[in-house]
Amino acid sequence: MSCSNLTMLVSSKPSLSDSSALSFRSSVSPFQLPNHNTSGPSNPSRSSSVTPVHCGLRDLRDRIESVKNTQKITEAMKLVAAAKVRRAQEAVVGARPFSETLVEVLYNINEQLQTDDIDVPLTKVRPVKKVALVVVTGDRGLCGGFNNYLIKKAEARIRDLKALGIDYTIISVGKKGNSYFIRRPYIPVDKFLEGSNLPTAKDAQAIADDVFSLFVSEEVDKVELLYTKFVSLVKSEPVIHTLLPLSPKGEICDINGNCVDAANDEFFRLTTKEGKLTVERDIIRTKTTDFSPILQFEQDPVQILDALLPLYLNSQILRALQESLASELAARMSAMSSATDNATELKKNLSRVYNRQRQAKITGEILEIVAGADALV
């Protein structure tokens, strides 16, 4: 008998964090039996109800095997993501002190140049008529709502700019963002760039060159960077911070002027407990170097600033790429963990249905034998 109406669906469900998880569910109850009385007139009160479906034992065995195979795949993807997210987190935490300290150094140099009334193009704040929005998305799916949350943040920012009467252009980084903006030709895109499984300074430099030329040529008056900030394994948040001109606060700030520097970092170790993958977490306070507001330079501050500004652009963009990758891997790990748990539960339910139907079939055969024996007596 056909088992076409008993389906296994894979859907995205939001978890407690910003990432979502895959889930498996059955569209009908597997415990319902079909109604064989179809000769009589239909009952209007039951015409809209879902017709129960009886799956054969072979169909159920195929379902169970399919779920087992899916469970193996999701478990493997979970372990791969767990191994990768550890390396990605180390890269993020290692790069944060350098990028945050560099911003503070540039701020102090810029303060001295402003007192000397020296004009530096990359630090000059001018009336905003057009904004370049760099959107950093992922390259792959199966990571819950990671990419959707980021794209919704970009859409909200675009609506805000339109409401203010400010023109904008998009620099899309990542395959998911590229495919989204390609399908929407009414959104102006300056450039499409591919992401990387292991972001490097070379990848960041390609983006930095583009935003540098746009800002210096005054095609845009402001450059904003939209990416997903890595907070912990179970939490990540899309943030927008101003890349150019240089922040007047001497720290990495979002578009509202709030600091997005990490006050502390979460370190974790992957261990096994009772045959299952577990995570041990440690919270470590982020240490930054305090600089005196009065700095002495051997070289001309303008020369130092000209040398550090390209490094500033590269480091900030590289940091965004690294944090986005770590957030994507953490979301994928969470999604695959949830999918594995749901596959295990679905396998138990299908096995229970299979055993009940097998038992009912054996009981029916025994009753037929007994009835046949009674008929011969």
From Swiss-Prot:
GO terms for molecular function: proton-transporting ATP synthase activity, rotational mechanism. Disulfide bonds join 253-259. Residues 1-55 form a transit peptide. Its main location: plastid. It is a peripheral membrane protein. It comes from the Eukaryota. One of its GO terms (biological process) is proton motive force-driven ATP synthesis. It is found in: Plastid, Chloroplast thylakoid membrane. Keywords: ATP synthesis, CF(1), Chloroplast, Disulfide bond, Hydrogen ion transport, Ion transport, Membrane, Plastid, Thylakoid, Transit peptide, Transport. Residues 37-52 have a biased composition (Low complexity). InterPro entries: ATP_synth_F1_ATPase_gsu, ATP_synth_F1_gsu, ATP_synth_F1_gsu_CS. Residues 30-52 are annotated as: Disordered. It holds the Pfam family ATP-synt. Produces ATP from ADP in the presence of a proton gradient across the membrane. The gamma chain is believed to be important in regulating ATPase activity and the flow of protons through the CF(0) complex. F-type ATPases have 2 components, CF(1) - the catalytic core - and CF(0) - the membrane proton channel. CF(1) has five subunits: alpha(3), beta(3), gamma(1), delta(1), epsilon(1). CF(0) has four main subunits: a, b, b' and c. Belongs to the ATPase gamma chain family. This is ATP synthase gamma chain, chloroplastic.
